[in-house]
From Swiss-Prot:
Component of the Mediator complex. GO terms for molecular function: transcription coregulator activity. This is Mediator of RNA polymerase II transcription subunit 10. It comes from the Eukaryota. It is found in: Nucleus. Coiled coil: none annotated. Pfam families: Med10 (PF09748). Keywords: Activator, Nucleus, Transcription, Transcription regulation. Its main location: nucleus. GO terms for biological process: regulation of transcription by RNA polymerase II. Residues 54-92 are annotated as: Disordered. Belongs to the Mediator complex subunit 10 family. The keyword Transcription regulation applies.
Length: 167
């Protein structure tokens, strides 16, 4: 059996949503016994669509890996990330995002908060890096003036760490 792809599950979800919309419309326009059979049919269709979705999203054991070519001139299979419609079993979501959705929150908010957190961390690291670079340069300048006999070692350390050389 071929692996279920993301587009298959996407189509199944769209079908479930369509059936829910049809049921909502049928309930809104409910006229009594004459529309009851139509409503029952729509509910049965929804049940079938949910069953299909459940079947497609059940975890299956991963397929065995394809045999590796022995000829080095044979081109390797394209990477999974290059596939626009990957198998469902290859998609892994961080548990934090799943918890966010379970708590009825928008996963885009999680993404935005994560990006802001990373930016803050990057700014902190940049500040520390600049502070240490400034400290390195000041220390080198002071060591050159206090211990002229170590000038060569100081220059070597500055070259190795990307510091400013004194002319």
């Amino acid at each position: 059996m071929a692996p279920v792809t993301l587009s298959t599950v996407d189509d199944d979800l769209k079908e479930v949503i369509q059936h829910l919309f049809e049921i909502q419309s049928a309930v809104h326009g409910y006229l009594g016994p004459e529309t009851q059979q139509e409503l029952v049919r729509k509910i049965k269709n929804l049940t079938l669509a949910l069953s299909t979705l459940s079947t497609h999203t059940k975890p299956h054991p991963p397929p065995p890996p394809p045999p590796q070519p022995t000829d080095p001139t044979t081109a390797a299979a394209p990477a999974l990330r290059d596939n626009p419609d990957p198998p469902l079993s290859s998609i892994q979501l961080p548990p934090e995002i799943i918890d966010y959705v379970d708590a009825a929150r928008n996963p885009d908010i999680y993404t935005r908060e994560f990006v802001e957190l990373v930016q803050r961390g990057n700014q902190d690291l940049k500040g520390k890096k600049e502070a240490f670079a400034s400290f390195r340069d000041v220390l080198a300048r002071e060591m050159r003036s206090a211990m002229p006999e170590c000038r060569g070692e100081v220059e070597r350390v500055l070259e190795g760490t990307g510091g400013k050389r004194e002319r």
